[in-house]
């Protein structure tokens, strides 16, 4: 640190007096044009320095260059609590969050690769007729003249202009217009007819109408007449004519636009928007470019066909009640020879179809209906569809939504595009086939396709292919080769989203930029880590400063500079305990250095648990890239599911097993991916999925409210003498209810001040000074602390404060046990990271009583965790297993994998080359597998112990 400080400050980003969150008035120096890693315990202040100080100041300075109107539209950006920052260049933050919640957003649209593919197909794509499969052809009028003279020489022909193609209508007005223009004949549905006054067709039938422009014998001597006829026919037929050979009875189409000469099918002139599923010109007309449609699922309407209608077999209706709809259904059943008490499985196909889809037949008079009125019945399906109307309440729409299932669009089969767009080809591939290729295969296709193009096509495609090739190179380099351009951005993990943005930034070739990344190694297998580090160095070598908030050992050792924040978390952190090169770091005495140089380590358990002898078996999993996989999990053990990125870990656990169990135990609506059978489900009584989603959507949500310890704390305050004298109830101590909360800020602790043309400013409430409660409520104190003081305590402080209160201590202590001692009891959920939110949820489950038969599912719980935090987490997970539960973890971190009792390793690669279980067993057994990539890295880890 001193070395940089002594040099010219223009060589670094110099931060002086940073006090954001828990930072202790620190100075930090980040060298320009270097790869710097900021590390430290969870909650030590890494993100406070990188994102909340450096990035926030960079954004603030950028926004200040805008007009006051623009600043108001963008919202307020507070100045971070720092004395000064010098040497700051433009800042770009690449965080771990899903790129886009829009179902139309894909990897292709985010990275712009799909945009270049659209341009490529619009310029050199070869059109093929979707009717005949023949290449589409377009001509000039001169070429059409030459073709007709050559093909129909000395033959009698009709020159026709197609006007109506397979459409309903009487066309009375059309015939009258043609008659007034002087035309005598038309061909209607293949028959030649004279145009007469009042001529009309059957309006309910589909018709084909062609105008007879001329009837002549083709001859080179009369080419001028033919040329003029072609010009008139082209004008009347909107650029299309048909030449009908009278003797042979055959017609041939000619067009100035792309046309099928056999069927007359015409395509628009191709443009990039014709290949976009976000454009009306390119999108599938059925699904509007989404690739899927919501259809009513009969299995959701009738989940159990062994039940009767009377006993509630039709879920939307429930059990029998004496109402009109049940009397109508009773009428259908009686008509078909059944009753409401007949099991649904015994009803005829016709009866069930009428119950679901309705009938126009008159029903037996239901009770209460006069004999003069015999109502018809619309059906259950129609009733549910009516509830999806915008005019009904959102509650009714939500109710109806449970009976729908997203289904692949029956028209485009998930391709999102219309038929025309899907019938342009380059080297035998349409744009959807390319979008569905894995990025590694697409890169190979792009690298070789140029050689297969014609000379003119090569000239046109050269620059477009260069842009595509560049972007695919970077996407493959950051370990995303198993994904495809068609992959929805909504389905990406935080780590995948971050690496996509990283690849996009590298491809943009910007220089003199400060990039700040938040744990880019998340979700990445050890094998792919080298490629990620190489990409970051590539970004640095372009002339950029790269700052990475990271815990990965390889990333630290490969960096140019390391800043270690500590020594502990929360109030005991916030200091720069080390700054220097990785080599200097290894010799320092910090906690991080101890884990890097091997003096500290996470110990491997002396003995592996074998489980309780019971198993959970999942057979025939075939979702996404899974190859008919059978999964067997020993219960009562710590199980790790491992494998390279894209090998199928999340597919088999999060998208197959977890939804199956959630449906069984909680009637979840989420459908699992395809599987054949599950056995052993009776050996567990609960499934708990601990993910990284926020613990609440409102800033009012916090660890105290989520764990429900706040209810215990409020009950404690109610029992205090002062509260009893005043007659206070628990609601008095809630900041969500009127009475005890501050009436000025409504319990928020701050007020929003409108600044007209400037952004609104958030200021602490002048009445409660940010404490959320009114003066009377704050007068009730326990051990000298008010309810607001308690919420402002860290978990570590609260554990000491409530040490003699078992009901409160038990819930707070588990938060401390999972490494969250540094966060505040009342800390808004919006300020918690994904890893912190996950551990709050884990602590909440730990505080509950269990039967010892619970299955816990955790997806990368080490996200955001330092080596020391992982050691603490492993202690918590082992406690769960020791109580008889099963813990199932999807993880890449070798410190967790080496401590597992049982490993399921998937692979061998990602994407189409994955989807298999490569090896199962203890870590030692995985090390012996020749096919396991995880085993190769695990072997090194276990050998170093």
Residue ranges of predicted features:
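Conserved phosphate-binding elements of NTP-dependent enzyme cores
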Residues: 1-945
């Amino acid at each position: 640190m001193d070395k940089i400080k002594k040099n010219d400050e223009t060589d670094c980003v110099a931060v002086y007096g940073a006090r954001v969150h828990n930072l202790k008035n620190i100075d930090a120096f980040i060298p320009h044009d270097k790869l710097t890693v900021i590390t430290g315990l969870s909650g030590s202040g890494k993100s406070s320095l990188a994102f909340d100080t450096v990035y926030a100041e960079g954004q603030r300075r950028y926004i200040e260059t805008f007009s006051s109107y623009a600043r108001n539209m963008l919202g307020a950006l507070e100045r971070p609590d720092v004395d000064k920052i010098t040497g700051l260049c433009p800042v770009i933050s690449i965080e771990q969050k899903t790129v886009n919640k829009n179902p139309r957003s894909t990897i292709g649209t985010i990275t712009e690769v799909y945009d270049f593919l659209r341009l490529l197909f619009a310029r050199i794509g070869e059109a093929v007729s979707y009717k005949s499969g023949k290449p589409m052809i377009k001509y000039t009028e001169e070429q059409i003249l030459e073709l007709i003279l050559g093909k129909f020489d000395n033959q009698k022909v009709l020159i026709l202009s197609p006007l109506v193609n397979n459409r309903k209508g009487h066309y009375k007005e059309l015939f009258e217009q043609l008659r007034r223009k002087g035309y005598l004949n038309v061909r209607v549905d293949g028959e030649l007819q004279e145009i007469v006054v009042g001529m009309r067709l059957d309006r309910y039938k589909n018709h084909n109408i062609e105008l007879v422009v001329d009837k002549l014998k083709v001859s080179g001597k009369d080419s001028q007449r033919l040329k003029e006829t072609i010009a008139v026919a082209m004008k009347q037929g909107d650029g299309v004519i048909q030449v009908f050979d009278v003797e042979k009875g055959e017609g041939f189409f000619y067009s100035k636009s792309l046309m099928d000469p056999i069927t007359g099918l015409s395509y628009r002139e191709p443009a990039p928007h014709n290949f976009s599923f976000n454009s009306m010109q390119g999108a599938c007309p059925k699904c509007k470019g989404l690739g899927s449609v919501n259809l009513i699922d009969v299995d959701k309407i009738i989940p159990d066909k062994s039940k009767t209608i009377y006993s509630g077999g039709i879920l939307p209706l429930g059990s029998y009640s004496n109402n009109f709809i049940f009397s109508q259904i009773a009428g259908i059943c009686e008509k078909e020879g059944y009753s409401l008490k007949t099991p649904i499985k015994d009803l005829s196909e016709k009866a069930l179809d009428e119950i679901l889809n309705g009938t126009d037949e008159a029903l037996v008079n239901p009770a209460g209906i006069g004999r003069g009125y015999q109502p018809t019945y619309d059906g259950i399906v129609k009733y549910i569809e009516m509830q999806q109307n915008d005019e009904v309440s959102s509650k009714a729409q939500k109710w109806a939504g449970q009976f729908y299932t997203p289904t692949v669009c029956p028209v485009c089969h998930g391709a999102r595009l219309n038929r025309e767009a899907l019938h342009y080809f380059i080297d035998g591939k349409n744009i959807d086939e390319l979008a569905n290729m894995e990025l590694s295969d697409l890169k190979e296709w792009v690298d070789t396709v140029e050689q297969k193009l014609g000379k003119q096509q090569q000239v046109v495609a050269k620059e477009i292919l260069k842009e595509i090739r560049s972007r695919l190179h970077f996407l493959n380099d950051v370990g995303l080769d198993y994904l495809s351009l068609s992959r929805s951005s909504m389905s990406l993990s935080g780590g995948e989203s971050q690496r996509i943005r990283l690849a996009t930034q590298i491809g943009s070739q910007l220089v003199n930029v400060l990039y700040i990344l938040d744990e880019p190694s998340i979700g990445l297998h050890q094998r792919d880590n080298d490629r990620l580090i190489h990409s970051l160095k590539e970004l640095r070598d372009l002339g950029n400063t790269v700052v990475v908030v990271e815990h990965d050992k390889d990333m630290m050792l490969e960096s140019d500079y390391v800043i270690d924040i500590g020594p502990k978390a929360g109030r005991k952190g916030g200091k720069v305990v080390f700054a220097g090169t990785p080599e200097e770091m290894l010799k320092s005495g910090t906690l991080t250095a101890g884990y890097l140089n091997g003096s500290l380590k996470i110990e491997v358990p002396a003995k592996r648990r074998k489980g309780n002898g019971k198993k959970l078996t999942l057979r025939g999993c075939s979702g996404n890239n899974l190859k008919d996989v059978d999964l067997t999990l020993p219960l009562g053990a710590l199980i790790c599911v491992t494998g390279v990125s894209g090998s199928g870990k999340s597919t088999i656990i999060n998208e197959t097993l977890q939804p199956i169990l959630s449906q069984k135990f909680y009637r979840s609506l989420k459908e699992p991916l395809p599987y054949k059978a599950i056995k052993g489900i009776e050996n567990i009584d609960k499934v708990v999925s601990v993910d990284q989603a926020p613990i609440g959507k409102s800033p009012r949500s916090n660890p105290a409210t989520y764990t429900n310890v706040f209810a215990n704390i409020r009950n404690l305050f109610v029992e205090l003498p002062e509260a009893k004298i005043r007659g206070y109830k628990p609601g008095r101590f809630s900041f969500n209810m009127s009475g005890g909360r501050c009436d000025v800020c409504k319990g928020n602790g701050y007020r929003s001040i409108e600044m007209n043309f400037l952004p609104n400013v958030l200021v602490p409430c002048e009445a409660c000074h940010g404490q959320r409660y009114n003066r009377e409520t704050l007068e009730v104190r326990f051990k000298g602390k008010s309810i607001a003081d308690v919420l402002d305590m860290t978990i570590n402080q609260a554990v000491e404060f409530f040490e003699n209160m078992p009901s409160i201590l038990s819930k707070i202590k588990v938060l401390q046990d999972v490494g969250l001692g540094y966060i505040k009891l009342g800390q808004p959920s919006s300020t918690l990271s994904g890893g912190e939110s996950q551990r709050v949820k884990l602590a909440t489950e730990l505080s509950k009583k269990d039967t010892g038969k619970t299955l816990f599912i955790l997806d990368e719980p080490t996200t955001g965790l330092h080596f020391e935090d992982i050691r603490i987490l492993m202690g918590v997970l082992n406690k769960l297993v020791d109580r008889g539960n099963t813990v199932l973890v999807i993880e890449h971190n070798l410190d967790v994998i080496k401590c597992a009792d049982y490993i399921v390793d998937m692979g061998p690669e990602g994407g189409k080359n994955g989807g298999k279980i490569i090896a199962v067993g203890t870590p030692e057994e995985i090390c012996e597998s020749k096919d396991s990539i995880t085993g190769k890295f695990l072997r090194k880890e276990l050998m170093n112990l």
